[in-house]
Amino acid sequence: MDISIEKGYVPGCIGRISELHARYYSRLVGFGVAFEARVARELAEFCARYDDQRDGLWLAALNGQVHGSIAIDGMLAGSEGAHLRWFFTSDEIRGKGIDSALLGLALDFCRKRDYRNIFLTTFA
């Protein structure tokens, strides 16, 4: 099993991250098109304004295909805090320490930028 973690945008990652979230949460709690559309829209907006000094995006890939992600949206870090977003690992890589590695990278990124607050939102 070849799992790697890459930083930054990779072609196809917006669609793949949206798909992973949509399939998992559809099965788990019945979320539908509104959820998938929101994930895709907000992730696309984030990627379009991505600033490597302010924001972070890490992708876990299994044999070259995205199977996990985490992001730090630092746009409002000075006022509201850094926004931890799109933290997910697929069933194929869950439980192998990749989720901890992704979270560690995101938290290290925040520490290096002196982001004092980090928040996570949920969808209901």
Language-model features: locations:
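Conserved beta-strand-loop-alpha-helix junction that forms the acyl-donor binding cleft
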Residues: 94, 119-124
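Short acidic/polar active-site loop segments enriched in Thr and Asp
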Residues: 116
